[in-house]
């Protein structure tokens, strides 16, 4: 995906965006698009390897992304993720809750 392929343009330069459920199809595409707009992206997913795959793709394309394992039903895990995001990317500007369950 390239910036010219996006159906929208928005300046997210240096904004920190956190996306839960980022290892899935929809949120991983969203993460890539947001990174192309200049955001630093934290990809959270229950399966770390899924989030890491997409974070690696974003970083390989010149973006800035980190992957973190998180179960959104566990507050302590989310608090740990928040601290890591602050440490690596800075304060969160945008949160996209894409994690779901059944």
Region spans (language model):
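A short, basic/flexible loop-to-alpha-helix module at the beginning of a structural domain
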Residues: 1-9
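Generic hydrophobic, amphipathic alpha-helix propensity
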Residues: 12, 26, 51-54, 58
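Rossmann-fold scaffold of SDR-type NAD(P)-dependent oxidoreductases
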Residues: 20, 92-100
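Conserved amphipathic alpha-helix within the SDR
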Residues: 55, 59, 65-69, 74-90
């Amino acid at each position: 995906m390239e910036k010219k392929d996006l159906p929208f343009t928005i300046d997210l330069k240096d904004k920190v965006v956190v996306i839960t459920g980022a290892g899935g199809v929809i949120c991983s595409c969203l993460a890539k698009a947001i990174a192309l707009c200049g955001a630093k992206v934290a990809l959270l997913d229950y399966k770390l390897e899924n989030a890491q795959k997409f974070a690696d793709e974003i970083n390989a394309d010149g973006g800035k992304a980190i992957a973190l394992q998180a179960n959104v039903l566990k507050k302590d895990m989310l608090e740990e993720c928040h601290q890591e995001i602050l440490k690596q990317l800075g304060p969160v500007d945008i949160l996209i809750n894409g994690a779901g369950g059944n």
